[in-house]
Amino acid sequence: MTLASAPASAQLKLAADFCTAEVLINDRSVCVVGPYSPTVRLDITQDLRFGSNQICIRLQKSAGPSAVALSIAAVDVAGTQLLNTGPHWTALAPGTLQDLGTVRSQLWGIGSASLDLSGADNYEQWRLATAANSETQVAKLRARPGFKITRLRTAGLDEGSWVSMAFDPAGQLTIAREDKGLLRFARDSDGLPAGAAELINGDLLECRGLLYAHGALYANANNSKALYRLQDADGNGTLEQVEKLREYSGGVGHGRNDLALGPDGWIWSIHGDSVDAPAAGTVFDRTSPLRDSRRGPVRQEGYVVKVSPDGEAAEVVCTGLRNPFGIDFNSDGAAFTYDADNEFDMGTPWYRSTRIWQLSPGLDFGWRVAQGQWPPYFPDRADNSVWQLDTGKGSPTSVMFGKHLKFAPDYQNCLYVLDWAYGRVLAVHMAPRGSMYRMAGELF
């Protein structure tokens, strides 16, 4: 790579699958990534020089289809200079280099708005909305080019704050109020919510998760501290039969959150670290029994539990989360969430940012309340296989795959996650890698 001057700035991106990759610039090692690491971005301004620069990638293969991709963008007096891996590179062992094509632009961040926040972005800017007395104007919202935002409905003065929603089999919208109760909205000729809200339940407190499945409405009622099933037993359109299927004791801050229908037909529920773990013997626990000796007197960790449709059986799927609000499944049947950071740890060496996790059975993601989180070298902690996407500061709420949306294919396969703190939606692109996925995010 030849530069007309010392660079004003230079950025490197590196991705390696099923191999360890070390990048050397002018015989100096600047970056090493493991076989299953996320895509790495690195400032290499100080590593490049005026004139000719030698870029070398040293690879060590592991089991699987090894591949590497690298790009460098350097700004000098002549403009932006680009260098990408490709067939023009030279392999030290002749005949060993194979061109596998280009990386999808979304996975490489080409044409995408960055997730990065500046130090000036106020984490508590949401407080500015507490004094709002009118609806948000669509003109103030920004979307990715090619997408349009349409306001469907604004909460009425007597409809409260909304925390979750679901569509019934007839396509009518059900919304949970933050304080208590469930509202139902009829549809107009265009299929949009219309008319006055109908109160279909006034007792359940803060239902953060709603799911229509198996001829019933399931509600994860956080402040009622239980999972409920609501049914229309007499077919008159009202959900008069309310059953408590599972009770979950504990606090309510990081509480009983979203619900999703698993590919196994069970009801998957995701909880934050305020909720007590199910008592031993009441559920089947897929995590390691070796965790017991390291739990401490108070467990305080978020977890995923799946419940049979009738509530009779339950299993803890994975644990060690902080406050993951949403859960959804991709087309392959894999579950994902968007987990919270501990904002009070910002600036400390042990700060753990918000991140996207694949919720594979048996995993412990290592979170323990406050500073009790496990180090990554504990043998049954999922950090040994590396987190999949670091999303920085934020406050995670709901997540949803676009598989049912009438979007372009690249955006049907995305996981959409809502960051409440900064009022933004992130689109997470994925590519299969073994039993898991490589991920890249963009501001949607």
Question: Model-derived features: where do they sit?
Answer:
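Short strand-edge motifs at loop-to-beta-strand transitions and within beta-strands
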Residues: 38-42
